[in-house]
Amino acid sequence: TFFPTINKENPYALSEEEELLMDKLTHSFKTSDKLRRHIDCLLAHGCMYSIANSNRMFHASVPLNKDGSLKDVTIRGKKYKGLELMKKTGYIVREAFNNDTPKEQKLFAIDYIWYLWCGKDSPLFDKNRMTTFERYFIADPAAHTEVKGYYYQYNNDEKIIDMILDSFGVQGE
């Protein structure tokens, strides 16, 4: 594998060109009106889930245990599952974007958004790990394995789906 811009004496340091690129990307991300409008729309219309016309909509999954029951996910020392997990996650996401969130909470919320992207019990990811790096640099397909959470095994099981719907206050048919 060839990494021509990595300095062996200081591998975490970026080259001047990389620094410039990161500065431009950071500026674009922080000042993008379009991104801000998209985030505002998401936060205004449900954030982590939405219920409309007796349908529950969400991005990826509801973390489940092996037996199909709702999985407890610990956030800052407290356990949440199902609807409570989605509500707490949405609240934390909003804390990251609210101007009046205290600094310590805001920093946690920003870190939590990163976790939502690739975390094991994240309702937006729900896999045991992310193997993007492995897929790019390791030829062995065994290194590419991402085990999906139990929701993906049960998402066609009417009994389990009805239990999830019930936990959100939505009646299955």
Pin down the residues of each PLM region.
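Feature recognizes metal-dependent phosphohydrolase scaffolds
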Residues: 1-173
